Amino acid sequence: MKKIVIAYHGYMFGSRYMEMMAAQFRLLLTTGLYQASSKIYFGIVEDENRKPLNGNAWIHDFWKFGSSKEKGQILSKVEIVFYPENRELRDTLHWIKDYARENPDDYILFFHSKGITHYTESTEDWRRYMEYFVIEKWKDCIAKLDEGHDCCGVLWNKDTPLGYFPHFSGAFFWAKAGYINTLNHDYIDSAWRYHMEFWIGSNPNAKIFEFHNSRLNDKDSLIANKGHYSIQYPRNMYTNE
C-alpha cells in the first residue's frame, strides 16, 4: 500500500473550535486512519478573539503520547505548524504541493475545520457528511486510488454560480501526490479566494471518483440559498445506519 499522508488545516476561531477539532482528531484515531498514516501535518491559524485562548498548548497536548515510555513527546509523524497570518487554506495547500513534488507516489488526504466561521447545525451536517466518506470510509478511498482514480470524495460539482469549475464542494478530498503535481498551482495564491477550492479540479483530464452527491450544492440549489450552508443533512440521508 502507498504511504498515507494527512494534511489538515485548522482555524482556531470563535468558541467552538476545540469541540470541532477534537471530534475530527478523534475520528482519525477511532477509524484507524491515524494508525495507518505515515505523516500528519497540521497547519493552524489562530484568531485573536478565539475562546479559549490556549489553542496552541491544547493541540500539542492532544497529540502527545499517553502511556508510552516517551510520554510528553509529540509523535514523530505529527507536525504542527502555526501560521503568522490568516491566508485561509493557502499555506496548507502549499505544503501539500511541496510535499507532493518530493513524494509523488504517496496518497494524500486533505480536510479542514469546515464551517467554523459559520457554525450551524447545517454546516456541522455538511462537515460530518464529508468526513463520513473520506475518513470513516478511508479504506474505500485508498481502494479507488489504487484502481487508478486520481482523486476521490463527495460533491464533485462542475457547473457553479461562479462559472465552470470542477471541484469537491467543501474541499475534503483524497488525491494521489502525482496528480497534485499536475494541477495549476497559480490557483492557490490567486486573489480570488474560490480558486483555492477549485485547485483540485484544475487538471481537465482528472480521473475522479465521487462516492456520493447530495445535490444540495448544485448551481440551482446554491442560487436559491438551499445549499449545505442552509439545509440540514443528517447522517441517515447518506448511510443505512
Predicted regions and their residues:
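ER/Golgi luminal nucleotide-sugar-dependent glycosyltransferases, focusing on the catalytic module
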Residues: M1-E241
